[in-house]
Every structure is written in structure tokens, then in C-alpha cells.
């Protein structure tokens, strides 16, 4: 391992011990905000610290085994220990490289999840509903909370558009690779000839950031319309103009919110989504600049990003970004998404490692 990397790991190890001591300090415990921040830092440093300590132990074993090679009686055992120590060193160094990759500061944040029906009419809306249910089931398995911010239901089920806030540990980091186009191939229930139709939806995943970190939005740049809500809601539907539509004139971004009965609450929700969308659009521009120099697996939520195809007759799901095909569609639609998410996370990390190794010392 490069001396510069060892030096960096030693510094992180020292910081881990320092933070551990601070967390036991009564003065720090009394300051809730500082205690929380240090607890997060400690959790982030724990894995790399543990892995580095294990690597150091293996290096000691390696040195001991090399010394034993000079002893004829111990040589055979030493060669076996040397082989094991070298294999362990290689594995631990790979783990440490991944742990040292630059962290996306947004990865630990909650996120806004948008699913929109694209081409395919009613069938696209039904599939948007299926996708949203899939993500909701996945959230349940990870003990995340899903709160619908806005829902525009399809005429025959599903959603023309649904926006939800997903809250929990590491939400954005897990879901960010879902942004892009999702295509379905199946026979719609309304299809009497049994023909397979192709429909599409787009998914956009944006980090939910604190208000202080959102781009400044000038009131003069906004066009705000009120209208009567439609869809579920019983006797309260269509009685007041509580639904809100906000248009950000410089970017053309439009957000609607009609889930709450209060116009004030709908406006607050719409503004939080609008801020996240504007920030996401700015980040997408930066990603496109990066993509000109290297492959970019992170989608922008645009329909031109073709992420996956869900083929129901074949029970197949294909991720086109990494050429991964699984014949486990039923499980995927029930929310078992780790089998799709983890391979693309690993591919993304491999790309990051390749970019880092190409940089000069």
C-alpha cells in the first residue's frame, strides 16, 4: 500500500480515537448538537478504523512469517502463513480503498422520490403505481418512512405523477441510482388480443437538504396558482382552492401539491420540493460535465436515461447501465431491490477507484 495512503489511514485512526474520547466527555454530552455531529463522525470512521487495525495486525503476521522462513523446521508452516497473510492483505487493501473513496455528503440525507408516467397512457400510469409500491416495500424492509407529498392519480389506477419524501438512514445514497427511465413490457389488462405493450416511466431521486442549503428563490421568479384538489379525499375534495401549483419561471420547473387540505401546508410542501428540484438540476449540469470525461452511472431523472426494462412475460429485469439481467422480477416488484442496487453501487465504486488510480501521486 502506498505510504501516502498509510499516512492518511493513520490520521483517520487517530481521529477515531480522539472522537471516541470526546463522546465520553460530560461537557460534549451536554451539547446535543455537537454530540450528534461527533456521533455521526464516529460512525463514519469506525469501519475504516477497524479495517486498518486488522490490516496492521496482518502486516505483523506477514513479518513474523517471513522471519520464520529462515528456520528449516518452521519453513513449511511459515510458507502457509505467508500465503494466508498475503491473501488477507490484498482483501483488506481493497476494502480500505473503497472506504477511502470520497463520500457524497448527500448520501446520508432523506430524499424526495418522484415517479412520473411517460409514454404508454393508462398502462404507464398503472406501472408508475407499481414502481411506487415497489419502492415503498423496499423502504419498509429498511425501516424508512414514506410520506406522500403530492399524488396525481391515473384514470384507471396508478399515478400520472407521485412525489414522496423518504426518510431514514442513508436513504439518498441507496436510492440515487434509481433516477432515470424505467420501461415495462407486458400485456395490459385491457388488451384483448394478448399483445405485449411497452410503456415507460421516469424516476427522479433528489436529496432533501436543509432550507439553509437550498438555492435562493426570489418571490418574483414564481408564478403561484391555486385550484381545487382532485382524487381521494371524500367530502373535502373540490370544496376549496387548497391545491397549489408553483412555476419557477427561470427554469420552467413546475411543482403541484394537493395532498393536504390546507393551502398553506400544500405551499410549504411544494416549495421544499421546488428547492430540491432546482438544486438537483444544478447538480445534473455538473454531472454532465463529469460524464464527458468518464462514464456516469448516476441518472438525472430524464426519460433519455434508460435504466431498466421490466419484462413481465419473461419474468426478467435488465439494468442496461451495467448489463445485468435477473430472472427474479416477482421478487423485485415486491421490493427486494438490493440485488439490483448493490451491483450498481459496486460498479460506481470501481469507476471511482479507477479514476483515483489514474491521478498522479
Swiss-Prot record:
It is found in: Cytoplasm. Peptide chain release factor 1 directs the termination of translation in response to the peptide chain termination codons UAG and UAA. Gene3D superfamilies: 3.30.160.20, 3.30.70.1660, 6.10.140.1950. HAMAP family: Rel_fac_1. Keywords: Cytoplasm, Methylation, Protein biosynthesis. The modification N5-methylglutamine is found at residue 235. This is Peptide chain release factor 1. The keyword Ribosomal protein does not apply. It comes from Serratia proteamaculans (strain 568). GO terms for molecular function: translation release factor activity, codon specific. The gene is prfA.
Amino acid at each position: 500500500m502506498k505510504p501516502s495512503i498509510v499516512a492518511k489511514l493513520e490520521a483517520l485512526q487517530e481521529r477515531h480515537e480522539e472522537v471516541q474520547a470526546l463522546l465520553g466527555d460530560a461537557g460534549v454530552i451536554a451539547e446535543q448538537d455537537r454530540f450528534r455531529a461527533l456521533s455521526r463522525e464516529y460512525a463514519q470512521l469506525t469501519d475504516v478504523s477497524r479495517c486498518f487495525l486488522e490490516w496492521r495486525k496482518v502486516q505483523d503476521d506477514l513479518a513474523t512469517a517471513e522471519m520464520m522462513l529462515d528456520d528449516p523446521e518452521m519453513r513449511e508452516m511459515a510458507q502457509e502463513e505467508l500465503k494466508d497473510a498475503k491473501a488477507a492483505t490484498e482483501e483488506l487493501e481493497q476494502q480500505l480503498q473503497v472506504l477511502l473513496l470520497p463520500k457524497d455528503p448527500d448520501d446520508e440525507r432523506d430524499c424526495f422520490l418522484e415517479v412520473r408516467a411517460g409514454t404508454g397512457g393508462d398502462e404507464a400510469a398503472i406501472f408508475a403505481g407499481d414502481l411506487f409500491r415497489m419502492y415503498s416495500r423496499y423502504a419498509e424492509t429498511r425501516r424508512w418512512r414514506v410520506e406522500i407529498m403530492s399524488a396525481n392519480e391515473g384514470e384507471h389506477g396508478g399515478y400520472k405523477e407521485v412525489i414522496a419524501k423518504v426518510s431514514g438512514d442513508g436513504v439518498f445514497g441507496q436510492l440515487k441510482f434509481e433516477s432515470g427511465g424505467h420501461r415495462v413490457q407486458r400485456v395490459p389488462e385491457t388488451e384483448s388480443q394478448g399483445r405485449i405493450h411497452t410503456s415507460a416511466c421516469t424516476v427522479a431521486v433528489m436529496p432533501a437538504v436543509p432550507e439553509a442549503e437550498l438555492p435562493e428563490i426570489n418571490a418574483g421568479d414564481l408564478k403561484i396558482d391555486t385550484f381545487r384538489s382532485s382524487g381521494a379525499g371524500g367530502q373535502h375534495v373540490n370544496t376549496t382552492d387548497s391545491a397549489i401549483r408553483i412555476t419557477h419561471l427561470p427554469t420552467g420547473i413546475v411543482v403541484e401539491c394537493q395532498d393536504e387540505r390546507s393551502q398553506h401546508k400544500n405551499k410549504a410542501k411544494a416549495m421544499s420540493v421546488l428547492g430540491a428540484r432546482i438544486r438537483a438540476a444544478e447538480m445534473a449540469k455538473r454531472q454532465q460535465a463529469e460524464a464527458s470525461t468518464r462514464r456516469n452511472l448516476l441518472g438525472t431523472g430524464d426519460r433519455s436515461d434508460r435504466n431498466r426494462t421490466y419484462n413481465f412475460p419473461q419474468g426478467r429485469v435488465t439494468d442496461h447501465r451495467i448489463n445485468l439481467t435477473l430472472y427474479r422480477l416477482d421478487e423485485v416488484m415486491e421490493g427486494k431491490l438490493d440485488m439490483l442496487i448493490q451491483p450498481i453501487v459496486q460498479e460506481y465504486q470501481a469507476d471511482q477507484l479507477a479514476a483515483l488510480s489514474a491521478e498522479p501521486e
